[in-house]
Amino acid sequence: MPPEIVVVGAGAAGIIASWRAAQLGAKVLLLEKNPRIGTKILVSGGGKCNITHDGELEDLLRAFRPAEARFIRPACYRFTNREIVKMLTSRGLEVYTRPDGRIFPVHQTAKDVVAILGSYLAEAGVEVRLSTPVKRIAHEGGHVVGVEVADGLISCPRV
């Protein structure tokens, strides 16, 4: 059975989007061009992984340009910075908050964060294909019909 949703990119946003869609019952395929998920997470905060910030959401949004803040505001209110921390700590990650409000893993390794996010994907039944760059998003009649990868077209109605 083909996926209902294909998510392109297994960075933080792609991982969370895939996991949440699968939680809501969708058959999800997550495509990543790199040989592992979370490549950008692994280098965030100098490899220590600045998970999020402890501030209020509106304070966080002020750090973005106005157009960016308008774009991400709805997603930030649907899945808050505090929920991200709870998601990780509920799986055993210990975190601490620096005086500037940035939240990091106690053991200062992004690998732990990526491993926990990977466990959420597996638990939700998300299919992950690594080393699979997307060539293009395929359209017919103004509608998405799939994504093209090296092996051919993966049919799906949502990307």
PLM segments and residue spans:
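Short glycine-rich loop/turn motifs that provide flexible caps or phosphate-binding loops at active sites
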Residues: 8-13, 37, 44-46, 145
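Short coil/turn connectors at secondary-structure junctions
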Residues: 2-3, 24-26, 37-38, 46, ...
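Anionic group-transfer/hydrolysis microenvironments
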Residues: 6, 34, 133
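Hydrophobic/aromatic ligand-binding patch that stacks against planar heteroaromatic rings
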Residues: 16, 20-21, 33, 40-41, ...
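Hydrophobic anchor at the start of a short beta-strand
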Residues: 26-29, 95, 159
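N-terminal Rossmann-like FAD-binding beta1-loop-alpha1 element of flavoenzymes
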Residues: 3-30
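Predominantly flavin-linked oxidoreductase catalytic cores and closely associated redox partners
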Residues: 43, 110-159
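Conserved N-terminal/central alpha/beta ligand/cofactor-binding core
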Residues: 33-127
